Structures are given as structure tokens and as C-alpha cells.
Curated annotation (Swiss-Prot):
Keywords attached to this entry: Ribonucleoprotein, Ribosomal protein, RNA-binding, rRNA-binding
Native species: Pyrobaculum aerophilum (strain ATCC 51768 / DSM 7523 / JCM 9630 / CIP 104966 / NBRC 100827 / IM2)
Ranges annotated as spanning the membrane: none
InterPro entries reported in the protein's UniProt record: Ribosomal_uS19, Ribosomal_uS19_CS, Ribosomal_uS19_euk/arc, Ribosomal_uS19_SF
Lineage of origin: Archaea, Thermoproteota, Thermoprotei, Thermoproteales, Thermoproteaceae
Family of the protein in this entry: Belongs to the universal ribosomal protein uS19 family.
Protein name (Swiss-Prot/TrEMBL): Small ribosomal subunit protein uS19
Pfam families per the UniProt record, alphabetical: Ribosomal_S19 (PF00203)
Length: 158
């Protein structure tokens, strides 16, 4: 296999099963030149200025009630995690923008059928939760056989 084919295969695998970057490597993270610690210490208004236009505009309008409720759940889960208890955060809010305070948590995002666990790393900041819980499967076509096409309807089954 050539190097290009290997790179393409790696890319496919990374897309189908996203790789999780371990917390030890988070020290190298920068978002618009800011470290994770700097982002966590910023006010919401300062953070909003760093976001792309679509997300910035959405957050300037204010959070929806569902998003506020999700943030309360996240803060409660962080408090309980400090005490040693584990809380599962489930949400239908696919349009929630990932904020720095969500980093390190696993949020179960609804994709229309089930809840998909999404581990949030610093590289997810500024994206939407729904981007990481795909709503459709990747099509893998099977082999043609009986009843696969209209012409095969006239072939006698054994």
C-alpha cells in the first residue's frame, strides 16, 4: 500500500471513529492564541469575541432556556465529580456551542435514535455538540443478490 493510500485509510478511520486526545497532551492546546487556562479565566464577553461569526452572533443573542438548563447540569456534574460521584449528562441540545467550562466532561448527545457519548476535549471548543453525534449512518452497500434489483425478481430462487 502506498503512503497516500495509508494516509487516506488513517483519515477514514479517524472520521468513522474519532481519536480522543489524552488530557496529558492538552498543554499544547491553543484557541486563537489562548491556552485552556486563559479561556477558563475569561469572562463570557471576552470569550465570545474569539469565536467565529456564526457562534459569536448566536451567543450574543443570549442562551436559550434549554442551553441554560444544560449549563446548570454541567456545573452540578462538576461539583459532584469533585466529591467523587459520577453523573451522566444527557441532552437533546445539539445546537449548544461547546464552551471552555465543558472541557473534560462526557456529554451524551441525542442523535434521533440513541444518546451518543461525546468526550469534550479543548479542540471541540467553539463547535456545536451536534457535530460530534452523527444522525445518519455511513452507507456501506452490500453485495447484489436476489431482490437487490428489479431484474433479479424474474430469476427463480433455488
Amino acid at each position: 500500500m502506498s503512503s497516500k493510500e495509508q494516509e487516506a485509510q488513517k483519515g477514514k478511520q479517524g472520521w468513522i471513529t474519532p481519536t480522543v486526545i489524552p488530557p496529558e497532551e492538552w498543554a499544547t492546546f491553543r484557541y486563537r492564541g489562548k491556552t485552556l487556562e486563559e479561556l477558563l479565566n475569561m469572562s463570557m464577553d471576552e470569550f465570545i469575541k474569539l469565536l467565529p461569526a456564526r457562534q459569536r452572533r448566536s451567543l450574543k443573542r443570549g442562551l436559550k432556556p434549554e442551553h441554560r438548563k444544560l449549563l446548570e447540569k454541567i456545573r452540578k456534574a462538576k461539583r459532584l465529580a469533585a466529591q467523587g460521584k459520577k453523573v451522566v449528562i444527557r441532552t437533546h441540545c445539539r445546537d449548544m456551542i461547546i464552551l471552555p467550562e465543558m472541557v473534560g466532561l462526557t456529554i451524551h448527545v441525542y442523535n434521533g435514535i440513541t444518546y451518543i457519548p461525546v468526550f469534550i476535549s479543548p479542540w471541540h471548543i467553539g463547535h456545536y455538540l451536534g457535530e460530534f453525534a452523527l444522525t445518519t449512518k455511513i452507507v456501506q452497500h452490500g453485495e447484489p443478490g436476489l431482490k437487490a434489483t428489479r431484474s433479479s425478481l424474474h430469476i427463480a430462487a433455488k
